[in-house]
Structure formats: C-alpha cells, structure tokens
C-alpha cells in the first residue's frame, strides 16, 4: 500500500492508502494536466497549483527521465511556460529541436536559472498590484499560467560548477 493522503479530522486522523498500484497505472496518453492538476495514476493527481514542487528520485535506468518527458508532454497541452534544464546534454536536451527554453550548456543553465528567478520575483510584485490579489493565494487564483523549471540531473549540474559558483 502507498499512503496518498493524511487528513486531520476533529478527533482522529484519516489516512488514505492506495493498494494494487499496478492496476491503478495509466498509459502515457492518459496522463493529462488540467485545472492545476496532473494525472499520474487512475486516482492519483499531482496538484501543482497547491503543491508546486516535485522531486523525482530513483535508481539508474528506473525511468525518471521518461517520467519527466511524460510530464512535459502533458504540460505542453496547457498554457504553462516550461524551462527545461539538462546539464548532461542527454534526452531532455534533445527537446531543444522542437521547443524553446531548453538548456544544457553551463552558461545557458546559469542564465536560465537567474532569468527564471528574476521573472518569478517580478511576477510576484505584479500579482500584488492586481485588484483581485489576496495574501496567501497564488498565480492560479489570479488566472495566470503556471511556470515550471524542470531540472534533470541536478547533481550533474552541481558537479559542473566550480567552488565559486556552487
């Protein structure tokens, strides 16, 4: 069983467990992103509007990059803005021939990270100036698209940096 949710009730804790994960798998073409959620399994969604971070870990050859490619394909069908970083110049770097904002060279990676951060801070300031802005709400509440920084092989990037840059 997989623990998929934990909710505190008045006088007890309610756990939601996912059993028979193999039967809950979906095909790649069934992975979809809509309404701030991305479908990962029949009954499992990543609610990126609520939890905008994801760490994918696993052994060599375990399918991490193919999983990321699947996420990218689903997100391309939304109004999201994607930035793809692949310091090993491997599978994700190949996307540069069919889409924008794909980086694999050290200088380009650093520039993308800096630009992404600056745009994030600027967007945050612009959001605070909007009429319908509310503290604690995010871009989705304001009807803005999600922005994703997708980083494959982060450890390889850290190794690529010198001590000063690190």
Locate each region found by the language model.
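Catalytic micro-motifs at enzyme active sites that drive phosphoryl/nucleotidyl and oxygen chemistry
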Residues: 2-6, 42-43, 136-138
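Conserved alpha-helical scaffold flanking the Walker A/P-loop in AAA+ ATPase domains
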Residues: 115, 119, 133-142
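P-loop NTPase catalytic phosphate-binding loop
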Residues: 24-128, 145-148, 154-166
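N-terminal "pre-motor" subdomain/linker immediately upstream of P-loop NTPase catalytic cores
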Residues: 1-33
């Amino acid at each position: 069983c997989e623990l998929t949710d934990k909710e505190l009730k008045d006088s007890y804790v309610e756990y939601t467990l996912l059993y028979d994960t193999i039967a809950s798998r979906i095909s790649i073409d069934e992975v979809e992103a809509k309404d701030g959620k991305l479908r990962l399994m029949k009954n499992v969604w990543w609610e990126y509007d609520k939890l905008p971070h994801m760490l994918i870990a696993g052994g060599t050859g375990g399918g991490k990059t193919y999983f990321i490619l699947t996420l990218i394909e689903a997100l391309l069908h939304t109004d999201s803005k994607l930035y793809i970083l692949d310091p090993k110049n491997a599978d994700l770097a190949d996307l540069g021939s069919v889409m924008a904002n794909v980086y694999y060279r050290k200088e380009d990676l650093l520039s993308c990270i800096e630009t992404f951060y600056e745009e994030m801070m600027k967007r945050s300031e612009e959001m605070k100036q909007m009429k319908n802005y509310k503290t604690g709400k995010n871009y989705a509440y304001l009807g803005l698209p999600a922005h994703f920084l997708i980083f494959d092989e982060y450890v390889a990037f850290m190794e690529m940096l010198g001590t000063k840059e690190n």
